[in-house]
Amino acid sequence: MGRKMRGAAAAAGLWLLALSSLLTLWGGLLPPRTELPASRPPEDRLPPHPIQSGGPAPEPRFPLPPPLVWDARGGSLKTFRALLTLAAGADNPPRRHQDDRGRHEPSGLSWPEERRAVHGGVFWSRGLEEQVPRGFSEAQAAAWLEVARGARVVALDRGGCGRSSNRLARFADGTRACVRYGINPEQIQGEALSYYLARLLGLQRHVPPLALARVEARGAQWVQVQEELRTAHWTEGSVVSLTRWLPNLTDVVVPEPWRSEDGRLRPLRDAGGELTNLSQAELVDLVQWTDLILFDYLTANFDRLVSNLFSLQWDPRVMHRATSNLHRGPGGALVFLDNEAGLVHGYRVAGMWDKYNEPLLQSVCVFRERTARRVLELHRGQDAAARLLRLYSRHEPRFPELAELSEPHAQLLQRRLDFLAKHILHCKAKYGRRPGDLITLRGREGLGYE
C-alpha cells in the first residue's frame, strides 16, 4: 500500500513539473507587459488647492482649449499654433454628454508642471485664472442698462463720484448711481468706447456697466431734480454716463514688480523667476494687473498707472500710494474706474504719453490666455474699430448721439492692437517653451462676444 502511494505522489510531481514547463513556454511567447502611465488630473480641471478626499474638482469658469497631446519624450505633438487657434464656439461652454461623466483624460503633465503659475512660458495657468474674482457679469450689465434707462432721478448730491462736475444720483427705487458729466463730449464718448472695448476684449468683469442718458430738465427722468441741475451747471441736452455706485471700494497700490523708485520697470516674466516666491493671492492680483496694463495701453489711458510713472520725476514714493482711478471691490476684483481719458482724449495726446505707456506694456511678458486670443484675433481681422462700433451700437440706444470713433482714431486703435499682438509673439518667442512655434488663428467664426 505504501509503495502504491509513493508511486502516485511521484506521478503527480511529474505532472506538476510538466505543467510548470508548459506555462513558462507560453509566457515566453507573450509580448512583454506594458506598464500603463500613472493617471494624472486633466489640466483644465486642476483645482487651486489640493482636493480633500472624495471632493470633486471644480468646473472651469471659462471654456478652455483641449488638453495638449504629448509624445513619449514629454514633448507636445501640438504646436503653439493649436494653442491659440480659436475653435468654433470657443466662448461657449462645451456640451457634456452622458457618456463623458466618468471619462478621465490625463493631460500628460506632471503635478509640479500643472501647479506652476505660468504655462507655455507666457500664459497664466488655468488653475490660477480660476481664482480671479468674478467682478461684473453680463447679466449684471444687461440688468443695469434696463434699470438706468427707466429710472427717475430723485436726488443729485456732490461727492463720491470723482470730479467735482459729477454727481451721485439716487433713483426712485433707492438705487444710487454715479452720473459723469464731461467737461467736453469726448470724455463721455471715451468712457463709453472704453467700456465696450473692455467687453470686446473679455475684460468687462473689471469695468462697471454703463448706460448713457440725456439731460433734459423737464424730462421724466430728471423732472424732480431741476434745481440740482441748475446748481450743477449742466448744459441742457448733454449726454452723461450712468454707472452703479459701488460701495466698500478700497484703494489699490501698485504691486511689487512695478514698484520702482528709480523709474525703471522690472519686466514681469516667468523665465527670470520673479514669480517663484509670490503667494497665490499676489499671483491672482498680478493676473488682473496684466489685463489692466494691456487695456490702458490699447485705450492710451494716461490717468491711471501712467500718471504715477510721470510723477516719479518729483515724487519717488508715488508707487507706494494709491493708484488713481483703480479700486478693489469687496470680492477682491480690481475695478477700472473713470475711463474717460481713454480712446478719444487719450488718442489725441498719445504722442505725449506713449513714452510711459509703451515701456509699461513691454514690462509685461505674462498674459491671460483668453485676453491674448482676442487681441490676436482682432490683429488678424484688421477690423477692430468696426467690431467695437457694432457692439456699441447694438447695446446702447443713444450711440448716435455721441460722435463715432474718427477714422484716424480707428486706425490708431488697430495699430495699437497690432503692436500688442507683436509684443505677445515676441514674448512667446523669447520665453516660451518652444520658441520656433508659430501662432495662427482661424477666421472670425465662433467668437461669441459681439
Swiss-Prot record:
CDD domains: Four-jointed-like_C. Residues 36-61, 88-111 are annotated as: Disordered. The keyword Transmembrane helix does not apply. Glycans are attached at residues 248, 277. Its main location: secreted. GO terms for cellular component: extracellular space. Residues 93-111 have a biased composition (Basic and acidic residues). One of its GO terms (biological process) is retina layer formation. Knockout mice for this gene exhibited an increase in dendrite extension and branching of pyramidal neurons in the CA1 region of the hippocampus. Acts as an inhibitor of dendrite extension and branching. This is Four-jointed box protein 1.
